[in-house]
Amino acid sequence: MEQLKMRFKKLTVLTPRDKQTELDVKEEIYDAVIIVTFGPALERLLRXAFLLARPNSAVRVIVRDVDEAKVLREVKLAGFLRVMKVNNNAWKAYDCEKPNVSVGATVPLKLPHLNKKSNVWNIKVMDDDLIDEDTLLKDEDYVKPIKESHEEKLNFCGELKKRRPCKNCTCGLAEIVESEKVVAQLKPGKSSCGNCGLGDAFRCSACPYWGLPPFKPGEEGRIKLETVNDL
């Protein structure tokens, strides 16, 4: 102890009896700090020693009945460097050193200067990005479609060319063929004797108007309502 006092101008010893808190400690006023403890107060005394010691000052930790691994861990966690065991008796001693750092000191951070401007999204709409709708149309799109006839639309039975509807026709071809037959029957026939309009008494056996009432020339196939008797 005397050798340490001669070596260092300002030296202090911390024991578990020291009840001073971190707020009461005067920071960085000692050239050397000695800690003597049984172990339970080791963590608290190491924090106080870090505040009391000046940068690059020496700290000796003297402990008893404390596991060596725990001592080394606590000393490093407190911030001390270059931990070395100097005594392996009942009282074990460890020397360490406070780094060249002042308590509460600030260190400037050298950040790279970004001269390049950050890319900003360009929300301006460019005309080049717009698509001309006329370019999407092809030549065949301008051709007027041909309207299909009614008979072509009804060509579901596959028998339009033969003019024969199927047995159970549901597409309407059977009705078309039947209506064409009725129209053909109502078309004026050619008279061979010239007496068709006079009545059945003057008509020949092959007259197309057989059974119809007499009519004037040009009124073939027409029935006058006044000639029909109400039943």
UniProtKB/Swiss-Prot annotation:
Q: Which PANTHER family match?
A: ANAMORSIN
Which Gene Ontology molecular function entries are recorded, alphabetically? 2 iron, 2 sulfur cluster binding; 4 iron, 4 sulfur cluster binding; electron transfer activity; metal ion binding
Q: Function, please?
A: Component of the cytosolic iron-sulfur (Fe-S) protein assembly (CIA) machinery. Required for the maturation of extramitochondrial Fe-S proteins. Part of an electron transfer chain functioning in an early step of cytosolic Fe-S biogenesis, facilitating the de novo assembly of a [4Fe-4S] cluster on the cytosolic Fe-S scaffold complex. Electrons are transferred from NADPH via a FAD- and FMN-containing diflavin oxidoreductase.
* InterPro entries noted in UniProt: Anamorsin (IPR007785), CIAPIN1 (IPR046408)
* Gene Ontology CC: mitochondrial intermembrane space
Residues annotated as region Fe-S binding site A? 157-171
Localisation: Cytoplasm; Mitochondrion intermembrane space
Question: According to the UniProt entry, where does the motif Cx2C motif 1 sit in this chain?
Answer: 193-196
For the ligand ([4Fe-4S] cluster), the binding residues are: 193, 196, 204, 207
Residues bound to [2Fe-2S] cluster = 157, 166, 169, 171
Q: Which UniProt keywords apply?
A: 2Fe-2S, 4Fe-4S, Cytoplasm, Iron, Iron-sulfur, Metal-binding, Mitochondrion
Which residues lie within the region annotated Fe-S binding site B?
Answer: 193-207
Q: What is this protein called?
A: Anamorsin homolog
Q: Which residues form a coiled coil?
A: none
Query: Which biological process annotations from GO are given for this protein?
Result: iron-sulfur cluster assembly
Q: What is known of its domains?
A: The C-terminal domain binds 2 Fe-S clusters but is otherwise mostly in an intrinsically disordered conformation.
What does this protein need as cofactor? [2Fe-2S] cluster; [4Fe-4S] cluster
Q: Where is this motif: Cx2C motif 2?
A: 204-207
